[in-house]
């Protein structure tokens, strides 16, 4: 009975692991100075996502690279966040985030734009399942700061449902305002 339960848990864990895409962002060789000299190890930064709106990042350290990557992947799966995507492909609104001296600005983009972002930010967007986004990083280009700043920005992003609940409005009222505000829409052309 217990053996059967253990096998079932392992199957569920393996099934859960297959739904995630992991991207290795950065590997760093680190040294610890000891009495006999230096001990070398590795630090890995990994981003994990299901390409449906969930994403997380993790940092792992070990004496060997594969072990550091495994630890980082496990840490990333423990810290997943959910990101609300518009039409399953982009952000609902422009948003900025920062961590330390790293700053990022994320902008929603029209369909067909693609992911216009550099380095570590691209790994986050691919893992979360975004297809159209424009991102700019300012300040520090340290991958750890950029990843954390990107996650800060993604946490600040709200879905229309959350904004409507906060303002005490209906979602349809918000979306009507959005259509009125979009340049080139039929309603705004009639008003001009």
Swiss-Prot record:
UniProt keyword annotation of RNA-binding present: yes
Protein name: Small ribosomal subunit protein uS5
Cross-referenced InterPro entries: Ribosomal_Su5_D2-typ_SF (IPR020568), Ribosomal_uS5 (IPR000851), Ribosomal_uS5_bac-type (IPR005712), Ribosomal_uS5_C (IPR005324), Ribosomal_uS5_N (IPR013810), Ribosomal_uS5_N_CS (IPR018192), Ribsml_uS5_D2-typ_fold_subgr (IPR014721)
Function: With S4 and S12 plays an important role in translational accuracy. Located at the back of the 30S subunit body where it stabilizes the conformation of the head with respect to the body.
A cellular-component GO term for this protein: small ribosomal subunit
Domain S5 DRBM: 20-83
Taxonomy, superkingdom: Bacteria
Organism: Methylobacterium sp. (strain 4-46)
Domain notes: The N-terminal domain interacts with the head of the 30S subunit; the C-terminal domain interacts with the body and contacts protein S4. The interaction surface between S4 and S5 is involved in control of translational fidelity.
UniProtKB keywords: Ribonucleoprotein, Ribosomal protein, RNA-binding, rRNA-binding
Oligomeric form and interacting partners: Part of the 30S ribosomal subunit. Contacts proteins S4 and S8.
Gene Ontology terms: biological process: translation
Location of the region described as Disordered in the Swiss-Prot/TrEMBL record: 165-192
Protein family (similarity comment): Belongs to the universal ribosomal protein uS5 family.
PANTHER family xrefs: MITOCHONDRIAL RIBOSOMAL PROTEIN S5 (PTHR48277:SF1)
Single annotated GO MF: rRNA binding
